[in-house]
Design a protein with these regions (language model features):
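Solvent-exposed loop/turn segments at secondary-structure junctions
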Residues: 2-7, 43-46
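Serine-dependent acyl-ester chemistry module
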Residues: 4-17
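Conserved, single-site charged/polar hotspot
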Residues: 13, 42, 193-194
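Short, contiguous acidic/charged loop-to-helix segments that flank catalytic cores in large enzymes
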Residues: 13-14, 53, 133-138
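Catalytic cores of secreted or luminal carbohydrate-active enzymes
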Residues: 23-120
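C-terminal beta-sandwich/jelly-roll accessory domains of carbohydrate-active enzymes
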Residues: 106-203
Length: 203
């Protein structure tokens, strides 16, 4: 996936930036096209260049995909295919004033938050206004892991987005330290912009 970037000198975090659409299209292409893979790279960039500043994570993740999907490499410690995917969003469920997110089996092993501030999560109500959210991991071992997301500013949430920005911030990964793919639970039309131009895009 395209790395995080900004055309401005200062680091700006824009949920309506067109790069969010690019990442979503890349994700959907991967999911519908045989013999393809998709590597997360937004966490390998910390500057305004569109090219990842840290090459090693991108190379390692790409090699994992090739070893697993092309050469059939196995993880000797698990007796299963070599893990190459980070957590992949599967479904959401509302629980009172919180939303619980589940991830595809096999991508969620060892699910954890790298940082205590759980950065990268946003939550919205029916007004479709997103607020920074708190998050924590539930379950594990014999119980499928999930992430619970909430915000005091959103008493009745209906949607969650994660790492949804031109410069995504994220903290969610699995036990192999592979980062979660950016995702959104909503299907609301998007209004990304490039410079001063606005576009409306339906999923």
């Amino acid at each position: 996936q395209i790395a995080g970037w900004s055309t401005r000198r200062s680091m700006t975090y824009d949920m309506n930036h067109h790069t969010n659409i690019v990442r979503e299209v890349q994700f959907n292409t991967w999911r519908t096209t045989p013999n393809t893979g998709l590597i997360v790279s937004f966490d390998a960039n910390s500057n305004s260049s569109i090219h990842p500043g840290r090459k090693s994570p991108v190379g390692d993740r790409s090699a994992r995909w090739a070893l697993s999907e092309v050469y059939g490499a196995m993880d000797a410690t698990r007796g299963k295919s070599l893990q190459w995917r980070g957590p992949v969003y599967q479904s959401m469920e509302k629980e009172k004033d919180r939303i619980r997110i589940t991830f595809e089996e096999g991508s969620d092993q060892g699910l954890r938050l790298e940082r205590a501030d759980a950065r990268g999560f946003y939550i919205a109500g029916e007004d479709r206004i997103f607020h920074h959210a708190d998050a924590r991991v539930l379950g594990g071992r014999d119980v499928p892991a999930m992430v619970e997301v909430w915000s005091d500013d959103v008493p009745s949430p209906v949607a969650v987005r994660y790492a949804w920005s031109n410069l995504p911030l994220g903290s969610l990964m699995n036990g192999k330290e592979l980062p979660a793919y950016p995702f959104r639970t909503d299907k609301w039309p998007l209004k990304p912009h490039y410079g001063e131009a606005l576009y409306e895009v339906s999923p």
